[in-house]
Amino acid sequence: MVEIHLKNSKSRKVELLQPIEPGRVSLYLCGPTVYDRAHLGNARSAVVFDQLFRLLRHVYGAENVTFVRNFTDVDDKINARALAEGREIADLTAETSQWYLDDTRALGVLDPNHMPRATEYIAEMVAFIEDLIAKGFAYARDGHALFRVRSFDDYGKLSGRSVDDMIAGARVEVAPYKEDPMDFVLWKPSSDDIPGWDSPWGRGRPGWHIECSAMAHALLGEQFDIHGGGADLMFPHHENEVAQSCAAGHGFANIWMHNEMLQVEGKKMSKSLGNFFTVRDLLDQGVPGEVIRFVMLSTHYGKPMDWTEKKRAEAEATLRKWYAALRQSVAEQEATPHLVDSLADDLNTALAITTLHGMYETGNFGPLAGGLRLLGLWSGTVPDWSEIAEVDLTYFAGRFSSARAEAMVTKDFTDVDALKSALTAAGVEVRMSKDGVELVPGPTFDPAKLEDL
């Protein structure tokens, strides 16, 4: 059997995956808080751990892998959005949960074995908290239940922090119901206008951290193999998960994996910079899901990823070539051992893609198909978008070249810009270089829009 090695955030070392139950693997991923569309950062986490899921299924067999990815459907952000839109919370979370599934499926993300919703596990959360209080790791005060951070000696080891440093260097909520500023909320009271459930501490709702611990315990048991999530969740979310779960006597996760963050054109993605994209934004712009996935897999999960227009164009061009090769009635073969070994080496998707390039260049299209399937980029049929429209753009290329040459002399690029805008609006990619102009029909190409030209 192939040996899989993964970077464990807890030990900061690449370790051999040794399943707790030989031959069977369990995986938990922190899923979305459902109140809006999934942005590209959310999508990276979904794609990365889907790729791990696919590798585990390939090595151990689909029936021997259990993957849990939750929906957080009780949260103050959800409450605020529902209030702002005048909607029922259940309607909002149902709609946005489906959005998430639709968008991630478009990226080739398989549905996990279990997709629990936090609201379905309130009883388990209450029981979990009661156990922590009984063991002295938590306490109740003023309708709240809180975890005593200093009672757990290993607090901070996952993220590499000490409690004293955290207090000195971070803004910590100071509240009268806390014994210590570092204590975190397990349960909090709810007013009449927001969701709440009966509990020994009064009507209220769970804190974010207890949700994942309770759902992981309910579906995977006291100890499981791998816990994943974005690097931004390591502290405080994952640190708090470790504390409350281990304090309860659960071994919790053996290996912790974290994917790094995503930026756009070299800058942090933010609405203020105007570079904030949701998955749906790109799909609606005609960017195929396979292209989005390819770009994400081109960077190792442990490194920051930069989404750029250049990478998108290169990914699309590469996939068009590969799909054209597979259109030739290729007999699909298993992914090669070399490609599987690349993925088994801390999920090195970038190396796996390099291996696929080599297969294409040497005409090994059968293994290419198998490799693309393992990477979630091939389902057995060539996607329609990859077929380049049969159209002669010679006239427009000549016209653009002439206008460009004249503009280089007159320094007036008005006609060039107008023609380029019209071509782009028609779904034509304009590629300019010192060798001339190349016009390439894109996935949204509409020849009707060229008629006025």
From Swiss-Prot:
Q: Which CDD domains match?
A: CysRS_core (cd00672)
Q: Which GO terms describe its biological process?
A: cysteinyl-tRNA aminoacylation
**GO molecular function annotations of the record:** ATP binding; cysteine-tRNA ligase activity; zinc ion binding
The prosthetic group or cofactor this protein requires is: Zn(2+)
Sorted keywords for this record are:
Aminoacyl-tRNA synthetase, ATP-binding, Cytoplasm, Ligase, Metal-binding, Nucleotide-binding, Protein biosynthesis, Zinc
> For this protein, what reaction is catalysed?
tRNA(Cys) + L-cysteine + ATP = L-cysteinyl-tRNA(Cys) + AMP + diphosphate
- Annotated source species: Jannaschia sp. (strain CCS1)
* Similarity-based family: Belongs to the class-I aminoacyl-tRNA synthetase family.
Q: Where does Zn(2+) bind?
A: 30, 212, 237, 241
Q: Which gene encodes it?
A: cysS
Q: Does the record bear Mitochondrion in its keywords?
A: no
The record describes its quaternary structure and partners as: Monomer.
Q: What name does UniProt use for this protein?
A: Cysteine--tRNA ligase
Which InterPro entries does its entry note? Cys-tRNA-ligase, Cys-tRNA/MSH_ligase, Rossmann-like_a/b/a_fold, tRNA-synt_1_cat_dom, tRNAsynth_Ia_anticodon-bd
Q: Which GO terms describe its cellular component?
A: cytosol
Q: HAMAP family annotated for this entry? A: Cys_tRNA_synth
Task: Indicate where this protein resides in the cell.
Answer: Cytoplasm
Q: Where is this motif: 'KMSKS' region?
A: 268-272
Query: Cofactor stoichiometry and binding?
Result: Binds 1 zinc ion per subunit.
Show where the record puts the motif 'HIGH' region: 32-42
Q: Where does ATP bind?
A: 271
> What EC number(s) are associated with this protein in UniProt?
6.1.1.16
